[in-house]
Regions:
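Classical Sec-dependent N-terminal signal peptides that target proteins to the secretory pathway
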Residues: 1-25
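Active-site catalytic motif of lipid deacylating hydrolases and related acyltransferases
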Residues: 25-118
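C-terminal catalytic-base region of ester-bond hydrolases, centering on the histidine
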Residues: 170-174, 178-252
Length: 252
């Protein structure tokens, strides 16, 4: 199922969100507060809500300063709207397939700990979405869980990646034989659980715009694809900002 993004709905949601945030104090003022959180599953906010959001971050290069900055605005919005929010942190130098094994254990423990939550939304951003794909690949059917990938590549043609990043990707793929290019059979069959892909226009995605191929251009049977436009409310929808727009839609 392929869905073109609804600009009108997001405009309304954006206005609501701006009003909400302007009337209250943010829980997180900086990415530095998120950076201090230990690896593993952590509670960002607990409430009586029947919905639980589980966030999974992506990869950060060694030179990256604002680690987890992309989650500050989404987390503040979720807290203000009193939605159960959890953050799964991990060593992004580990293989996503290995990370997913630990995540699935943490996810099962979390579901058992919060039986009153009847809908779980797992949201992986960028390489966090790769963790989501390995997670859903090895998950039993659970209709209470919806898996989301945001700004996540679905395949990698290393020969068409700019030289500036090619070497690091080659090293990761050599280290991790189970990688993005291992999903061909799984994608053709589809997954047991519901999967929603939130895709950007490749040319407006800072992570992928210089690639000589479209890493989003891969079909996953029975998944839902939400295609973002190049901009919303005058703001470019890029690799980072698409996460916030996706969260707005997921919880509304």
């Amino acid at each position: 199922q392929y869905i073109m993004f609804n600009r009108t709905l997001t405009t309304i949601l954006g206005i609501i969100c701006l009003l909400t945030i302007s009337l209250s104090d943010d829980k997180f003022s900086s990415f530095r507060e998120l950076k201090k959180i230990s690896n593993g599953m952590s509670i960002i906010h607990a409430s009586d809500s029947k919905v639980g959001i589980i966030a999974i971050h992506g990869f950060y290069p060694a030179y990256w300063v604002g680690i987890h900055h992309e989650w500050v605005q989404p987390f503040n919005y979720l807290v203000e709207n009193d939605i159960n929010t959890f953050f799964y942190k991990y060593d992004w130098n580990d293989c996503p397939s290995s990370v997913a094994v630990d995540f699935n254990k943490e996810l099962n423990d979390l579901i058992n700990k919060y039986p009153n939550i009847n809908q779980w939304q797992v949201v992986g951003h960028s390489m966090g979405g790769t963790v989501v794909l390995f997670s859903v690949l090895n998950s039993e059917l659970n209709e209470r869980i919806i898996y989301n990938t945001v700004a996540t590549a679905l395949h990698m043609d290393i020969g068409k990646v700019p030289m500036t990043t090619r070497m690091s990707i080659e090293k990761r793929f050599e280290k991790c034989p189970d990688n993005l290019n291992s999903f061909n059979e799984a994608f053709s069959k589809g997954f047991k659980n519901k999967l929603v892909q939130w895709r950007n226009v490749k040319e407006f995605d800072s992570q992928f715009k210089k690639y000589d191929f479209d890493p989003y251009d891969k079909e996953i049977k029975n998944s839902i694809v939400v295609q973002f436009p190049d901009s919303l409310n005058g703001e470019r929808v890029g690799h980072t900002s698409s996460l916030y727009f996706a969260i707005l839609e997921i919880v509304n």
